[in-house]
């Protein structure tokens, strides 16, 4: 049985190392009991059933580095089924679009192309009886998200009638032939959790863990890449809780009533894992169930534009003549995209369950180094080093 358990754990660790790297780290279930001697103070092995035992024997501290690198989190858009905007244009004549209608939301359950999240932090754990850890991390995180333009509700106004764009005009087309990507700044992040060795048999340990993490970075850069409207905004600002039409100065540098684009990231996770100690090496395999959300309060960011038209242009968008042979002289703004904007929707995990494989290297029962890979619900790697006081 021991040989079979060794083979299974080593095979899983090898598979995780050669496969693609895939929430929060599960960690080694043996962590609470691996470092039994202190770097500064000598470790004391206390027995909770010993009437002479004290809390000094029961409690110890560990500290170290915590690095978690998510290369591709599997996310989808959390949005309603309908989206209120102008009516879909029909025919070839210019028209005014001032009445809102509920149209099918192209962002509903849309999958994102890529979502990355990187965290570097300090780690401290309070250990009880060499069996249970209560820990926290304090550090910094930054991220990157990319998806089809429909996932961000990229919309604009096309074919508007008249020589001006009235304040009550609504966007009437959803732009699906583009990509939107955003980068966040590096912002403070924290997490708390608990881990325990629930069952031990010889060199095998079965444990469980719970974690919660949070961060609130600002969007550093927003890039919209679309053939009819392409723009990039550094430190974008937009409108929260504002329905169409947006204010007439939306997109102008001096616009008022805007707020910074901030993403509220939070995630919680429960997991279980099994380890087997082979001298100084402790491989482990586990499963986890996690939920992550990225919520920017559905902030809507307008394309940068000029405060007044120059050469009949308010933004650097191309003309779209279709089968027309000349620009319209009566409908000055009908042949290129107007009042373009995108919305940073709420994103959440598309897959909740994942698998974890990793190994811990222990030195003199005082120091340890852990490497871990996570699969299925994300592609991620985790490294940590810690010592016992």
Swiss-Prot record:
This protein's UniProt keywords: Cell outer membrane, Cell shape, Disulfide bond, Ion transport, Membrane, Porin, Signal, Transmembrane, Transmembrane beta strand, Transport
Annotated localization: Cell outer membrane
Pfam entry (one): Chlam_OMP
CC terms in the record's Gene Ontology section: cell outer membrane; cell surface; pore complex; symbiont-containing vacuole
Domain of life: Bacteria
Keyword field contains Disulfide bond: yes
GO molecular function terms attached to this record: porin activity; structural molecule activity
Membrane protein topology class: Multi-pass membrane protein
InterPro entries membership: Major_OMP_Chlamydia
Quaternary organization: Part of a disulfide cross-linked outer membrane complex (COMC) composed of the major outer membrane porin (MOMP), the small cysteine-rich protein (OmcA) and the large cysteine-rich periplasmic protein (OmcB).
Function per UniProt: In elementary bodies (EBs, the infectious stage, which is able to survive outside the host cell) provides the structural integrity of the outer envelope through disulfide cross-links with the small cysteine-rich protein and the large cysteine-rich periplasmic protein. It has been described in publications as the Sarkosyl-insoluble COMC (Chlamydia outer membrane complex), and serves as the functional equivalent of peptidoglycan. Permits diffusion of specific solutes through the outer membrane.
The protein's name in its UniProt record: Major outer membrane porin
Organism: Chlamydia pneumoniae (Chlamydophila pneumoniae)
Taxonomic lineage from the root: Bacteria, Pseudomonadati, Chlamydiota, Chlamydiia, Chlamydiales
């Amino acid at each position: 049985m021991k040989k079979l358990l060794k083979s299974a754990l080593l095979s899983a660790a090898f598979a995780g190392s050669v496969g693609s790297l895939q929430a929060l780290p599960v960690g080694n279930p043996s962590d609470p009991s691996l470092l039994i001697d202190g770097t500064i103070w000598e470790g004391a092995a206390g027995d909770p059933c010993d009437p002479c035992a004290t809390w000094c024997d029961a409690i110890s501290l560990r500290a170290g580095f915590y690095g978690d690198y998510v290369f591709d989190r599997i996310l989808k858009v959390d949005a309603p089924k309908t989206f209120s905007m102008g009516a879909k244009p029909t025919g070839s004549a210019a028209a005014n679009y001032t009445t809102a209608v509920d149209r099918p939301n192209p962002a509903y359950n849309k999958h994102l192309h890529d979502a990355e999240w990187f965290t570097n932090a300090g780690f401290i754990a309070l250990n009880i009886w060499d069996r249970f850890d209560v820990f926290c991390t304090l550090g910094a995180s930054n991220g990157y998200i990319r998806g089809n333009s429909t996932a961000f509700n990229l919309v604009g106004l096309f074919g508007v009638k008249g020589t001006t764009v009235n304040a009550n005009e609504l966007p009437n087309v959803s732009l699906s032939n583009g990509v939107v990507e955003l980068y966040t700044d590096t912002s403070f992040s924290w997490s708390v959790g608990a881990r325990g060795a629930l069952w031990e048999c010889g060199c095998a340990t079965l444990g469980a863990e719970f974690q919660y993490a949070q961060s609130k970075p600002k969007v550093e850069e927003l890039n919209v890449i679309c053939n009819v409207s392409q723009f990039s905004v550094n430190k974008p600002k937009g409108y929260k809780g504002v329905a169409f039409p947006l204010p007439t100065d939306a997109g102008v540098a001096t616009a008022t009533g805007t707020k910074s684009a901030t993403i509220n990231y939070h995630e919680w996770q429960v997991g279980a894992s099994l380890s087997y100690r082979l001298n100084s090496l402790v491989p482990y395999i586990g499963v986890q169930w996690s939920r992550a959300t990225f919520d920017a309060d559905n902030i809507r960011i307008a394309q940068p534009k000029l405060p007044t038209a120059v050469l009949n242009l308010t933004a650097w968008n191309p003309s779209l003549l279709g089968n027309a042979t000349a620009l319209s002289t009566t409908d000055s703004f009908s042949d290129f995209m107007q009042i373009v904007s995108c919305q940073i929707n709420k994103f959440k995990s598309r897959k909740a369950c994942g698998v974890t494989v990793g190994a811990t290297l222990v030195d003199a029962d005082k120091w340890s180094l852990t490497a871990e890979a996570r699969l299925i619900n994300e592609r991620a790697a985790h490294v940590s080093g810690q010592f016992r006081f």
